[in-house]
A protein has these predicted regions:
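Charged, low-complexity intrinsically disordered terminal segments
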Residues: 2-152, 158-159, 166-387
Length: 387
C-alpha cells in the first residue's frame, strides 16, 4: 500500500515517568540507557543519579548524549491509565527550551505536548510545526494554529511521515513514535533523544526545507550537512549516520548495511514490502547468518509483504507476526548486535521514493543491546500471539 497503511498509525501504549534534578526521564520496562559507562541503568539508580541540568535549558552540556525509550503497551487498554508516558517526558524537555522548538509530526493529538508548545511560544520561544494533510485537523495542529503558531501542511498524495522534534538547535527526538495517544499508550514504539549540535543541524536543515521552502518528497534536495556525526560519550565517541528520504537513497544504504552483516540480522517491521531489503535478508539467511524478524500482523499481506517470501524460504526463516492487540509500530534493524537502524522509515517503496522520512544508524553495542532486549520482548509476545 503506497501510503504505508497510514490509518493504522493511529492505534497504539507506554510506560512510566520519573522526574529528578530538573530533568524528566522516561523509564519504560526499566530500559533507559545512560551513556555513562555503557550499561543499562537500574530504574531506582537512574532516578537518583540523573545529572544536574542547567536551569531552564533543554540543551545543557550536562545532558546525557543519548537516551533511548520504548513504550510498554498494556492489555486491555484503559484510557484512565494514560499518564506518565513519553508525552510527559517530551513536554518536560519543551518546558526547558530557551530559543526554539521545531516539530515535524505526521500525526499529533497529544494535548500535553500541544500545551507545552503553546506555553513555550507564549514565553518567547520560536515554535514551528510541519504536519501532513491526513492529520491536519487533529488536536495538535488545531491547537497550535488557534494559538497563532505557524503550521505548514504537506498536502501531497504522498505523506510527510517524519516524527522528530528539535529543541534549541541542540537536542533531537526521533524514532517510530507518533505524537498520539495511541502511539504513546497502545503501540510498540521507540524514540531516541540525542544531544548533538551537528545532528540537530541536519534535522533543522530538513525541517527548513519543508517549512520555509515547501520542499517535500522528491523535491527535497540532498544536502544533509553532516552525513556522519560523532557523539561524545566520556572519553569515547559514538558514530551515527543520518539520512533523509527520498533524497538520500535510504533503502540502498540499508541494503549495504545488511550485506555487511557477519553474524546476525534482527528486525521489527510495521510495514515491510521492499523486495531489495527482503532479498538481502533472504540471501544472508541462506548464507548461514541468524536472521529473525517480527512483522506487524495487520500489514503482513500475502501478496505485498516480505513475510510470505521469508516463510517460504528454505530453510524457513525465523519470522513471526506480532502479538500486540493494537500495533507493533517499530521500524528497526539490528545488525551483529552492534549497529541499529531506526527512525520513521518503513521498509517500503513509498518510504524510499515519495514520503518524507528520516533514519539513523547508530553504531554502539550498548544501544544495540537495548534494542536486542526490546526485540526479545516483541518476539516473545509474537510467540504468545494476539489476545
Amino acid at each position: 500500500m503506497n501510503r504505508d497503511n497510514k490509518q493504522m498509525l493511529k492505534t497504539g501504549k507506554t510506560g512510566w515517568l520519573a522526574a529528578a534534578t530538573g530533568f524528566v526521564a522516561m523509564l519504560v520496562l526499566a530500559v533507559v540507557y545512560l551513556l555513562s559507562g555503557g550499561e543499562a541503568a537500574n530504574p531506582a539508580e537512574y532516578v537518583q543519579g540523573l545529572p544536574a541540568a542547567k536551569e531552564g535549558a533543554a540543551s545543557s552540556q550536562n545532558d546525557d548524549p543519548i537516551l533511548v525509550f520504548f513504550t510498554d503497551p498494556a492489555y486491555p487498554d484503559d484510557p484512565a491509565d494514560h499518564r506518565d508516558g513519553l508525552d510527559e517526558a517530551l513536554a518536560a524537555d519543551i518546558d526547558r527550551a530557551q530559543a526554539s522548538v521545531d516539530v515535524a509530526a505526521y500525526d499529533f493529538d497529544l494535548e500535553s505536548v500541544a500545551d507545552a508548545l503553546v506555553v513555550a511560544y507564549r514565553r518567547g520561544v520560536r515554535v514551528r510545526l510541519v504536519t501532513d494533510s491526513d492529520n491536519a485537523e487533529e488536536l495538535g495542529a488545531r491547537q497550535l494554529g488557534s494559538a497563532g503558531l505557524p503550521v505548514v501542511v504537506d498536502d501531497r498524495d504522498a505523506i510527510m511521515h517524519d516524527k522528530f522534534v528539535v529543541i534549541d538547535g541542540r537536542v533531537v527526538w526521533t524514532g517510530s513514535w507518533n505524537l498520539t495517544e495511541s502511539g504513546t499508550y497502545r503501540n510498540n514504539n521507540n524514540v531516541a533523544r540525542i544531544a548533538s549540535d551537528e545532528l540537530a543541524e541536519n534535522y533543522t536543515a530538513e525541517f527548513e526545507e519543508m517549512f520555509e521552502e515547501r520542499e517535500f518528497g522528491p523535491d527535497s534536495p540532498a544536502d544533509t550537512p553532516h552525513r556522519q556525526v560523532l557523539v561524545a560519550d566520556g572519553s569515547e565517541e559514538i558514530r551515527i549516520e543520518s539520512y533523509f528520504a527520498p533524497e538520500d537513497r535510504v533503502a540502498d544504504r540499508l541494503v549495504e548495511l545488511l550485506a555487511g552483516a557477519e553474524d546476525s540480522i534482527r528486525f521489527m517491521a510495521f510495514s515491510f514490502t521492499d523486495d531489495r531489503l527482503g532479498d538481502e535478508m533472504i540471501r544472508q539467511h541462506e548464507a548461514g547468518l541468524t536472521v529473525q524478524g517480527v512483522f506487524e500482523g495487520r500489514n503482513a499481506d500475502p501478496v505485498y509483504s516480505e513475510f510470505g517470501r521469508m516463510v517460504e524460504a528454505q530453510p524457513r526463516m525465523d519470522v513471526r507476526l506480532d502479538g500486540n492487540t493494537y500495533m507493533m509500530h517499530h521500524k528497526v534493524i539490528i545488525v551483529d548486535d552492534k549497529a541499529v537502524a531506526l527512525g520513521s522509515f518503513n521498509f517500503s517503496e513509498a518510504a524510499d521514493t515519495v514520503n518524507d522520512e528520516n533514519l539513523l544508524i547508530i553504531y554502539d553495542r550498548g544501544i544495540a543491546s537495548l534494542f536486542r532486549a526490546e526485540f526479545r520482548r516483541i518476539y516473545r509476545e509474537a510467540l504468545e500471539g494476539r489476545e
